Amino acid sequence: AEVKLGADDGALVFSPSSFSVAKGEGISFKNNAGFPHNIVFDEDEVPAGVDVSKISQEDYLDGAGESFTVTLTEKGTYKFYCEPHAGAGMKGEVTVT
């Protein structure tokens, strides 16, 4: 699955913001617009036992085209956000099946 950080029209969103992947399928988060973004999984909004520090990308992806890939191995729903833009609504959710 590929997720854009920033919509094609410049909106501060994950695109798509809600999606599903199979357990073990990689998710590539790619900076689309060149604004600094990161991907932080909410420790209260992931399946029990998941260590969010191991799946989050807290360092900023500053440039267009920079990417971060993560593979989730526990089934369930994970919520994530971009720290600098969470207040603008840059949040997302992935369901692992």
Swiss-Prot record:
<keyword id="KW-0150">Chloroplast</keyword>
<keyword id="KW-0479">Metal-binding</keyword>
<dbReference type="GO" id="GO:0005507">
    <property type="term" value="F:copper ion binding"/>
</dbReference>
<keyword id="KW-0934">Plastid</keyword>
<dbReference type="InterPro" id="IPR008972">
    <property type="entry name" value="Cupredoxin"/>
</dbReference>
<dbReference type="InterPro" id="IPR002387">
    <property type="entry name" value="Plastocyanin"/>
</dbReference>
<feature type="binding site">
    <location>
        <position position="37"/>
    </location>
    <ligand>
        <name>Cu cation</name>
    </ligand>
</feature>
<dbReference type="InterPro" id="IPR028871">
    <property type="entry name" value="BlueCu_1_BS"/>
</dbReference>
<protein>
    <recommendedName>
        <fullName>Plastocyanin</fullName>
    </recommendedName>
</protein>
<comment type="similarity">
    <text>Belongs to the plastocyanin family.</text>
</comment>
<keyword id="KW-0472">Membrane</keyword>
<comment type="function">
    <text>Participates in electron transfer between P700 and the cytochrome b6-f complex in photosystem I.</text>
</comment>
<keyword id="KW-0249">Electron transport</keyword>
<feature type="binding site">
    <location>
        <position position="90"/>
    </location>
    <ligand>
        <name>Cu cation</name>
    </ligand>
</feature>
<feature type="binding site">
    <location>
        <position position="82"/>
    </location>
    <ligand>
        <name>Cu cation</name>
    </ligand>
</feature>
<keyword id="KW-0186">Copper</keyword>
<dbReference type="Pfam" id="PF00127">
    <property type="entry name" value="Copper-bind"/>
</dbReference>
<dbReference type="InterPro" id="IPR000923">
    <property type="entry name" value="BlueCu_1"/>
</dbReference>
<dbReference type="GO" id="GO:0046028">
    <property type="term" value="F:electron transporter, transferring electrons from cytochrome b6/f complex of photosystem II activity"/>
</dbReference>
<keyword id="KW-0793">Thylakoid</keyword>
<feature type="binding site">
    <location>
        <position position="85"/>
    </location>
    <ligand>
        <name>Cu cation</name>
    </ligand>
</feature>
<feature type="domain" description="Plastocyanin-like">
    <location>
        <begin position="1"/>
        <end position="97"/>
    </location>
</feature>
<keyword id="KW-0813">Transport</keyword>
<dbReference type="GO" id="GO:0009535">
    <property type="term" value="C:chloroplast thylakoid membrane"/>
</dbReference>
<dbReference type="InterPro" id="IPR001235">
    <property type="entry name" value="Copper_blue_Plastocyanin"/>
</dbReference>
<dbReference type="GO" id="GO:0009543">
    <property type="term" value="C:chloroplast thylakoid lumen"/>
</dbReference>
